[in-house]
Amino acid sequence: MRVLIAGATGAIGRPLIRCLKQDRHTVFALVRSPESSHVVTQLGAEPVTADALDAASVKAAIDRTRPNAVINELTSLPRHYTAAEMRAAAERDLKVRIEGNANLLAAPQDTGERRYLLQSSAFWYAPGDGLADESASFAFDASAAVAAGARRYAQLEAVALATPGIAFVGLRY
């Protein structure tokens, strides 16, 4: 399978490349810099230069790689998870997640139905009995901060679910 990973140099993207290569998939990694190209090449992926916030460059990357699956692990989280750094990174992280997701989904595919896996979140589930699964509701009636996070992830999933030609999987971890 031909797999394109957006967010390939992050904490999840790097081991994901290794796992996919071990299973003999052809792996492409969306990168913005020569340093990132070097990292993903060392891991066995083919770098594809594009900026997730630039729809034209994302379209060109999709056209070039013709993936059967796109895995969206895009974030813009700080190196250290202090309250101050998280606040400082929040606006950019939100932009990367929303616009990057939209650009990846908007790129037309001519490879038939494409699988689209999106990093979602399990942190925003509504309380319930037993284990939660992908059908569990987000906590929309929680505190303002939790409800905002829940709405954000629900919106990302809804956009993917509404995209024609996409077999969507929300990765809630």
Where are these regions (language model features)?
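N-terminal Rossmann NAD(P)H-binding glycine-rich loop of SDR-like oxidoreductase domains
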Residues: V3-H25
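Rossmann-fold NAD(P)-dependent oxidoreductase module
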Residues: P15, C19, A107, V159
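Conserved glycine-rich Rossmann-like NAD(P)H-binding loop of the short-chain dehydrogenase/reductase
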Residues: H25-R32
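Conserved beta-strand positions in the Rossmann-like core of class I SAM-dependent methyltransferases
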Residues: F28, V48, V169
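NAD(P)H-binding glycine-rich loop region in Rossmannoid oxidoreductase-like domains
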Residues: P34-T41, A45-N103
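Conserved Rossmann-fold NAD(P)-dependent oxidoreductase catalytic core, especially the SDR/UDP-sugar
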Residues: H80-A147
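Conserved beta-loop-beta element that borders a ligand/cofactor-binding pocket
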Residues: R115, S120-S121, E157-Y173
